[in-house]
Design a protein with these regions (language model features):
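Active-site histidine-anchored catalytic micro-motif
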Residues: 1-149
Length: 149
C-alpha cells in the first residue's frame, strides 16, 4: 500500500471568503502514485472549514449569508470575555472571534475522506473541495493524506 502526506499553505483574502482547493487535492493524489484508495483532506484550524460543494457564486453567497445570520458577530461570546476566559490564551493579543469558533463547530467540517479511483478524486460533477474562512485572513494549513494501491 502506498501512502503520502502533503501539507499546503493557503490564505483567504478576507473573512467569509472561499478558496477552491480541488486542484491541490488532485495534485496530491497524482504525486502520490495512488490509483485506487482514498484521500483525506484535513484543516487543523478552529475558525475555518473544508466544504465539498458546488463552486457557484450564488450558492456560495447564500451559504455565507445563512452562516452569518445563524451566528451573528455582534452578540456576547464567552470566548471573547477575557475577564472570564482562562484557557488557551495566546501570549499576544486575543482576537474577538468567538463567532468564528461557533460557526466552525456548527459546520463540523475540518476533514473529508474522498475516494480515489483510476488515479482521480471521485467527486460529483459539480463538487469542489473548498476552504471557507470565517476569521481574519491568515495563513492556513491543509493536510492531504493519500493512501491505497
Amino acid at each position: 500500500m502506498k501512502s503520502s502526506t502533503v501539507t499546503i499553505e493557503v490564505s483567504a483574502p478576507a473573512r467569509y471568503t472561499y478558496l477552491d482547493l480541488t486542484e491541490e487535492l488532485e495534485r496530491a493524489i497524482k504525486d502520490s502514485g495512488v490509483t485506487d484508495g482514498a484521500a483525506i483532506a484535513f484543516c487543523p484550524h478552529t475558525t475555518c472549514a473544508l466544504l465539498i460543494n458546488e463552486w457557484e457564486e450564488g450558492a456560495l453567497e447564500d451559504f455565507r449569508n445563512r452562516v452569518r445570520h445563524l451566528v451573528p458577530e455582534d452578540v456576547y461570546y464567552a470566548h471573547d470575555d477575557l475577564d472570564r476566559r482562562t484557557q488557551n490564551l495566546a501570549e499576544s493579543h486575543e482576537r474577538q472571534n468567538g463567532h468564528s469558533h461557533v460557526k466552525s463547530m456548527l459546520l463540523s467540517a475540518s476533514s473529508h475522506a474522498i475516494p480515489i479511483s483510476a488515479g482521480e478524486a471521485v467527486l460529483g460533477r459539480w463538487q469542489r473541495l473548498i476552504l471557507f474562512e470565517m476569521d481574519e485572513p491568515k495563513g492556513r494549513q491543509v493536510v492531504f493524506h493519500v493512501f491505497g494501491g
